[in-house]
Amino acid sequence: MADVISSLQTQLKELDTKFAGNNVLNQLEQRTNLPKSYLVVGSTIFYLLLIFINVGGIGEILGNFAGFVIPAYYSILALKTTTTKDDTQLLTYWIVFSFLNVIEFWSKALLYIIPFYWFLKTIFLLYIALPQTGGATMIYNRFISPLTDKYILGPKKTDGVQQSVKEASRATGAATH
């Protein structure tokens, strides 16, 4: 138990250090006499609680907001880099995010079948959005890549075979239909 408390205290100190230059959090810290880490963690818990409770449908807008803002921030940073590793992560995220939004639009029954849908969706989106988790890469390798290879890239292979057959038939004088 002491290890858990020590680990939490270390992580809270890291949060305080990370947000040391944030003017808004510095002002809130001065007014409330609470460390920045407590303010960040408390705000995050409150935000997720609002999504979980979903009073008046607020869970939908808050979940989609979190699912958009954090990856949009990372996307803007990725545009400034020269590597493609972060690009693949983010493109995969945006594919999954768009897919979920299309399904939600056409299947409102899904929202009633799955309890706490907006909360679960938000947790899932955060899992695949944050580069530290590698969630988008896992989703891409396990689900998106096999589907795209089979249904999108598959016909191009047969188109190449058909083209080869046509060229061979022209060369030999055989008729094709």
UniProtKB/Swiss-Prot annotation:
This is Protein YOP1. Pfam families: TB2_DP1_HVA22. It comes from Candida glabrata (strain ATCC 2001 / BCRC 20586 / JCM 3761 / NBRC 0622 / NRRL Y-65 / CBS 138). Residues 1-35, 79-88, 128-177 are cytoplasmic. It comes from the Eukaryota. It is found in: Endoplasmic reticulum membrane; Golgi apparatus membrane. The chain crosses the membrane at residues 36-55, 58-78, 89-103, 109-127. Its main location: endoplasmic reticulum.
